[in-house]
């Protein structure tokens, strides 16, 4: 009887936790900047690479290609979140690998927090897994770089 009462009290709480942990597609929408953690000192470096996940299910990745500040879209297409940890991107345009056009790319992701996205994937036709880390770009005043006071 005590076990039954315990289960009746705990089961709904476990269900609430599962619901709270589920990732909603809206939480991925926005502008993300790629970062890289230095292997020597652990410092996080901002890369000149951004990904835009739009509410209409389209995405694009762009970067600054040279010191003059020229930017280009490197990849674009559509995306769909298939579960709490998987996105499938359908590539409709790519300057980095034109053979990807028309193909699907499965991304395994994890939100470390609301503003940090960790992604791993294998590009179609490749055997090595890639790992990326992205941070959300927000409407806020720029922070001072570390070391400048």
Predicted feature descriptions by range:
Residues 82-87:
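Short, conserved beta-turn/loop elements at beta-strand boundaries and strand-helix junctions
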Residues 1-25:
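Bacterial Sec-dependent N-terminal signal peptides
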Residues 16-74, 88-149:
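Lipid interaction determinants
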């Amino acid at each position: 009887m005590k076990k039954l009462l315990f289960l009746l009290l705990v089961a709904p709480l476990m269900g609430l936790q599962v619901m709270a942990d589920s990732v909603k597609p809206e939480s991925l929408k926005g502008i993300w900047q790629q970062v890289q953690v230095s292997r020597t000192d652990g410092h996080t470096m901002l890369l000149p690479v951004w990904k835009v996940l739009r509410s209409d299910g389209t995405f694009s990745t762009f970067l600054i290609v040279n010191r003059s500040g020229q930017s280009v879209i490197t990849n674009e297409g559509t995306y769909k979140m298939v579960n709490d940890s998987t996105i499938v991107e359908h590539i409709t345009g790519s300057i980095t690998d034109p053979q990807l056009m028309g193909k699907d790319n499965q991304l395994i992701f994890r939100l470390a927090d609301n503003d940090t996205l960790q992604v791993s994937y294998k590009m179609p036709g490749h055997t090595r897994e890639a790992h990326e880390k992205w941070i959300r770009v927000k409407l806020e005043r720029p922070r001072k770089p570390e070391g400048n006071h």
